From Swiss-Prot:
Claim: rRNA-binding is one of the keywords in the record: yes
Molecular-function GO term, any one: tRNA binding
Protein name in the entry: Small ribosomal subunit protein uS7
Domain of life the protein comes from: Bacteria
Bridged cysteine pairs (disulfide): none
Alphabetical list of PROSITE patterns matching this protein: RIBOSOMAL_S7 (PS00052)
Alphabetical list of PANTHER family matching this protein: RIBOSOMAL PROTEIN S7
Family designation: Belongs to the universal ribosomal protein uS7 family.
Gene3D superfamilies associated with the record: Ribosomal protein S7 domain
Keywords assigned: Ribonucleoprotein, Ribosomal protein, RNA-binding, rRNA-binding, tRNA-binding
One Pfam family linked to the record: Ribosomal_S7
Function field: One of the primary rRNA binding proteins, it binds directly to 16S rRNA where it nucleates assembly of the head domain of the 30S subunit. Is located at the subunit interface close to the decoding center, probably blocks exit of the E-site tRNA.
Length: 156
């Protein structure tokens, strides 16, 4: 283990355009090769598409989508006497949100569509309606934890 002190966690500042912390976190996940302005443009285009299609507030829809994709439990591998068990553990709120954003971005990239903004908008709208790949991934994670409930006493 490292002998240094743990790094101080920096606070996430709200996005300048949408005044939202989750938007800042999503821009960081969308960004490739340090191109932040491109990631911000993709997000603003996706939000404008969502606004056109739904007629509602895209920020509210985005927050609903993240909430619907956030897992509450996950399984972690734990070695006990030569056997590896999948131990279900509760997910801290920060980690759950980070996982949800990661899944939303990765499944957006995997979607068929023209631009990344359109793919992201589609995935966010699906997640807000409790459909889409990110929500399905969350359900799979919960099912896996439920199936391995017998190993919950190995929690560390």
């Amino acid at each position: 283990m490292s002998r240094r002190n743990a790094a101080v966690k920096r606070p996430v500042l709200p996005d300048p355009q949408f005044n939202n912390r989750l938007a800042t976190m999503l821009v960081a996940r969308l960004m490739k090769h340090g191109k932040k302005s491109t990631a911000q443009r993709i997000l603003s285009d996706a939000f404008s598409l969502i606004g056109e299609r739904t007629g509602g507030d895209p920020i509210e829809l985005f927050e609903t989508a993240v909430k619907n994709a956030t897992p509450l439990v996950e399984v972690r591998a734990r070695r006990v006497g030569g056997a590896t068990y999948q131990v279900p553990m509760e997910v801290r709120q920060e980690r759950g949100t980070a996982m949800a954003l990661r899944w939303l971005v990765s499944f957006s990239r995997a979607r068929n569509g023209r631009s990344m903004a359109q793919k992201l908008a589609g995935e966010l709208m699906d997640a807000a309606n409790e459909a889409g790949s990110a929500v399905r991934k969350r359900e799979e994670t919960h099912k896996m934890a439920e199936a391995n409930k017998a190993f919950a006493h190995y929690r560390y």
